[in-house]
């Protein structure tokens, strides 16, 4: 059996795995236990009442968090003409068509998000085996294939998070950094839950948001009492 580190022992002693914490108490606990030598992210796991084996119950989308994620995001855009100028003006680091595709084929992928206008998908489609496994393939379901590339760039820069349930019906994403004010983390979490509720599949029955847990990059999960969140997020 692996030996517990001092940090792991502290977390084990502080976090009650059987308890649902009020959101304010949970955030204070996460901040107390975030002792890594870097600013840890605050991540959320949301257990959904869906059958992930059925394609019509899968949940996928994107939403802009009111206070962003605390990450600087580099954006690449496949488009041309006036859209290319608009993308650059909106802050995209890389804009192009075949030239950008050639960079990616060479392994030059210094970006976090890829956006494409519909007319560029003939070029982007060639990159599926490279971009797909890295989660960088543009998709209309999360707003990264769109005629309005400038708005998509602004959303990405403003702290948009993309979400997709895993095979167990759980959504994993980030809602900010541990040095965010508690109110900002709470509001970001509520915004995500509102977006997930709007994305509820009509075929999903029973309780939809079954469990919400927060953790930091290096910390343990803390279950959240949802009654302490805004009415819209419940």
Curated annotation (Swiss-Prot):
Q: Which key words are in the record?
A: Repressor, Ribonucleoprotein, Ribosomal protein, RNA-binding, rRNA-binding, Translation regulation, tRNA-binding
Q: Name one GO biological process term.
A: translation
**InterPro entries cross-referenced by the UniProt entry:** Ribosom_uL1_bac-type (IPR005878), Ribosomal_uL1 (IPR002143), Ribosomal_uL1-like (IPR023674), Ribosomal_uL1/biogenesis (IPR028364), Ribosomal_uL1_3-a/b-sand (IPR016095), Ribosomal_uL1_CS (IPR023673)
| UniProt GO cellular component terms | cytosolic large ribosomal subunit
Q: Which Gene3D superfamilies match?
A: 3.30.190.20, 3.40.50.790
- State what this protein does: Binds directly to 23S rRNA. The L1 stalk is quite mobile in the ribosome, and is involved in E site tRNA release.
Protein name per its UniProtKB record = Large ribosomal subunit protein uL1
Which species? Serratia marcescens
């Amino acid at each position: 059996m692996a030996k517990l580190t001092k940090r792991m022992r502290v977390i084990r002693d502080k976090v009650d795995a059987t308890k649902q914490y009020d959101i304010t108490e949970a955030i204070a606990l996460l901040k107390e236990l975030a002792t890594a030598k870097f600013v840890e992210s605050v991540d959320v796991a949301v257990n959904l009442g869906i059958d992930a084996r059925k394609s019509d119950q899968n949940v996928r989308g994107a939403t802009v968090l009111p206070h962003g994620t605390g990450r600087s995001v580099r954006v690449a855009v496949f488009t041309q003409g006036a859209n290319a100028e608009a993308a650059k003006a909106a802050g995209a680091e890389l804009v192009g068509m075949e030239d950008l595709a050639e960079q990616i084929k060479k392994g030059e992928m210094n970006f976090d998000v890829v956006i494409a206008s519909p007319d560029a998908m003939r070029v982007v489609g060639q990159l599926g085996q490279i971009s797909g496994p890295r989660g960088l393939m543009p998709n209309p379901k999360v707003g990264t294939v769109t005629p309005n590339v400038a708005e998509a760039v602004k959303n990405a820069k403003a702290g948009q998070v993309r979400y997709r349930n895993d095979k167990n019906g759980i959504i994993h994403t980030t809602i900010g950094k541990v040095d965010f004010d508690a109110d900002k983390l709470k509001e970001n979490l509520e915004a995500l839950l509102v977006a997930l509720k709007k994305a509820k599949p009509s075929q999903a029955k029973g309780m939809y948001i079954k469990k919400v847990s927060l953790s930091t990059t290096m910390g343990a999960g803390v279950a959240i009492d949802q009654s302490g969140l805004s009415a819209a997020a419940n």
